[in-house]
């Protein structure tokens, strides 16, 4: 049997401690884990795809089986190109489940060979989102407990221009 390969897609604008928690836990389960950084055209990003990738590479440097790449198009197609058999999605609350279930069902329809794995976030991060981090930081709030230090510095630099 070959390597167990999975993809964790997201905009990660910016990556939070909640994202990192899911990545670290998935990295223990899968032999190879691709963090695919997406550019969501419906959102105005704070960071470029390249900046987000660099931050993710820094905070996952201790995980040798994690690879950070940018991706566009359908996640299920990207996963297939990488030889992945799984897409990992973090769930913060029941409210995330309905949306994620619809996406998982569509992905299953498009490619029945790729499973979606839902991972419940650590309860201490259940309220956390990139949008919330940006909102707090915009008003000079303290985000040190919400994001890795490299991200804290980068977010502060963006809002203190």
From Swiss-Prot:
UniProt-recorded Gene Ontology molecular function terms: ATP binding; pantetheine-phosphate adenylyltransferase activity
Positions bearing the site annotation: Transition state stabilizer: 19
Keyword list, A-Z: ATP-binding, Coenzyme A biosynthesis, Cytoplasm, Magnesium, Nucleotide-binding, Nucleotidyltransferase, Transferase
Catalyzed reactions per annotation: (R)-4'-phosphopantetheine + ATP + H(+) = 3'-dephospho-CoA + diphosphate
Enzyme Commission number: 2.7.7.3
Keyword Transferase among UniProt keywords: yes
Enzyme class: transferase
Listed pathway(s): Cofactor biosynthesis; coenzyme A biosynthesis; CoA from (R)-pantothenate: step 4/5
Gene Ontology CC annotation, any one: cytoplasm
Major site of localization recorded for this protein: cytoplasm
PANTHER family reported in the protein's UniProt record: PHOSPHOPANTETHEINE ADENYLYLTRANSFERASE
Subunit structure: Homohexamer.
Record-stated family: Belongs to the bacterial CoaD family.
Protein name (record): Phosphopantetheine adenylyltransferase
Organism: Listeria innocua serovar 6a (strain ATCC BAA-680 / CLIP 11262)
Gene name per UniProt: coaD
């Amino acid at each position: 049997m070959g390597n167990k390969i999975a993809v964790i897609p997201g905009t990660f604008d910016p990556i939070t401690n909640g994202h990192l928690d899911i990545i670290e836990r998935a990295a223990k389960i899968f032999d190879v884990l691709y963090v695919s950084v997406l550019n969501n055209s419906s959102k105005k990003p704070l960071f470029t795809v390249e900046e987000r990738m660099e931050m993710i590479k820094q905070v996952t440097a201790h995980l040798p089986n994690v690879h950070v790449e940018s991706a566009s198009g359908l996640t299920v197609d990207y996963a297939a190109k990488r030889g992945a058999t799984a897409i990992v999605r973090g769930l913060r609350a029941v409210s995330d489940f309905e949306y994620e279930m619809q996406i998982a069902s569509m992905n299953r329809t498009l490619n029945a060979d790729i499973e979606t794995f839902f991972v419940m976030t650590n309860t201490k991060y259940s309220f956390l989102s990139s949008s919330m981090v940006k909102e707090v930081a915009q008003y000079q709030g303290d985000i040190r407990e919400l994001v890795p230090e490299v991200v804290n510095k980068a977010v502060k630099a963006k809002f203190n221009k």
